[in-house]
Amino acid sequence: MNTNPTPISFEDSERYTFDKVPNESRVKIYGVQYILIADETGNEFYVTREGWRLRDNLHAENWYNDQRFAKEGERLVEGTGHVYRMPTTNRHGNQTDLVVKFSRFAEAVPLHVAKTFPDKMPADVGSAEFNDPFQEFGLLVDLRNGRFGPAEIQIKTKHPVAIFSPAARVAPWRLGRAKGRFERHRREIDNHSDEAFAKIDFDYERQYIYLFAWVKGENAADYMKEGKLGEKETRALTKRVESELKQKGFKVLDHKPSHIILREDSHGELLRHDGELVYALVDFELLMRTEEYEDYLRARNEKL
């Protein structure tokens, strides 16, 4: 199947479970399936399996229209990107906090990308490119599945809910996309789309916005500033997370404490398991597989 997907409405989506939506409204990119929902204004929502139960919260009027995410949401400090925490309430009164993050794919990566801990910047940063939305979700789902590396290591992350593309066009110069980079992402999304499903193409004049489920807690950098986490332990935690990511076949080029979320227990102490801090990761614009994992995947595919 090579046709464009046929979107369904939010109303029609109520008739289906995720697996029962017809294939003509479904795409599979980088190994992840999405259902395309469009509203009456032409806004598009590529909803993941994990996001399907939250789709009633995704209506644009709940968080996007009139820039509600900026006026009512909390601006999060994540490098130079635009990221917001936005509480939403659906028509049934169910509340869900979403993370709203504007994709920067095909833009230049800021030169000040660097790690707070450890001190050495990876060589990959010099040629780094932001993942496109489907690429990032694909890598994130792969990381969450944890099929590579030690089974006892499971990396917790925020849940990928949907990729939102507003109907309104935006002048390319305002988006800051380089045409050459954008065309490479177009080719990559075509190459990594499953032929059994409909296929999509990126639009040069449309925005793409990530929607994640909010991860409760506070980042390690803030805990360090508050004095609840010492600099030595913050440094050790950051190196431990980097090591565990590598063992699971991944690396994040701008890895830093502000991307590591910690929680407190009922006594107000940082949550630990067997003496080690329990953490979850956020921010995956520069997530990539290690060479070892890429080699493993190539060898596996050659056997198929």
Q: Over which residues does each language-model region extend?
A:
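Catalytic activation segment of kinase domains across protein kinase-like and atypical kinase folds
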Residues: 197, 251-304
